[in-house]
Amino acid sequence: GGSGSGETSGMWFGPRL
């Protein structure tokens, strides 16, 4: 839900770079 695309388990920031 932040700067990235890896939202898992209700996390806010999960940038999969």
Swiss-Prot record:
One of its GO terms (cellular component) is extracellular region. The modification Leucine amide is found at residue 17. Keywords: Amidation, Neuropeptide, Secreted. One of its GO terms (biological process) is neuropeptide signaling pathway. InterPro entries: Pyrokinin_CS. It is found in: Secreted. One of its GO terms (molecular function) is neuropeptide hormone activity. Its main location: secreted. It comes from the Eukaryota. Signal peptide: none annotated. Belongs to the pyrokinin family. Myoactive. This is Pyrokinin-5. The lineage of its organism: Eukaryota, Metazoa, Ecdysozoa, Arthropoda, Hexapoda.
